[in-house]
Amino acid sequence: MKNLIWRLLAKLLARPAVANWLITRAQRTPYQHIMSADGQDTYMGRWWLFNPHDRGTHIGRYAWFPWSIRIHHILRPDADRDLHDHPWNARTVILRGKYVEQRPASSEWKDSVRSCLVQGADPKWHEWLTRDACEWLRRDTGDTAVLLHGQYHRIDQVSEGGVWTLFITSRWQGDWGFLVKGKKVDWRIYTGEKP
């Protein structure tokens, strides 16, 4: 039921008049944009719709409403080849445009592949075949998706002109990082900011 409500809300928020209003309103309160590694291009523009955190302490001002709400304009795919997670649980609503997201394959997908293979094959072979398997999910205008802390993904393709999303995050859960050979690598080490 909860997912149905989110799907209906996503369709409403993606209506052109509503999406335009949200984007215009958010652009009055810029947040830190994410630049390319060389600092020449914007990878993602970010603006606040609602920031519950104190600017100085970064502590939530409202215990009863721990979510932050931003507008993101994703201009290009993730340049990193490895999947990454985020420091909080999040929900995204695609307001305008579309993208293709890469995520580790779900158990359902792996079971489907397994059922198509030779019966009685060595279980280690099945495990090897599906260990690093990924699936690609298309996210269109009006779609919504959840990404929990510790779930990995990457943006693989972005529509021309970029994709505009409403991005809702919960309380901080832990540092974010990249999934490298099945292990989480801290983002500072992965990006070379920390040796």
Where does each model-flagged region fall?
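Short, conserved beta-strand element in jelly-roll/cupin
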Residues: 86-101
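Active-site or metal-binding loop neighborhoods of secreted/extracellular toxin and effector enzymes
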Residues: 175-195
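Conserved short histidine dyad/triad with adjacent acidic residue
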Residues: 70-85, 103, 149
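A short glycine-rich, His/Asp/Glu-containing loop-to-beta-strand
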Residues: 40-78
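Short acidic-glycine-tyrosine-enriched beta hairpin
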Residues: 102-154
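A short hydrophobic beta-strand segment most commonly corresponding to one strand
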Residues: 144-146, 160-177
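Membrane-proximal basic amphipathic "stem/tether" segments
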Residues: 1-26
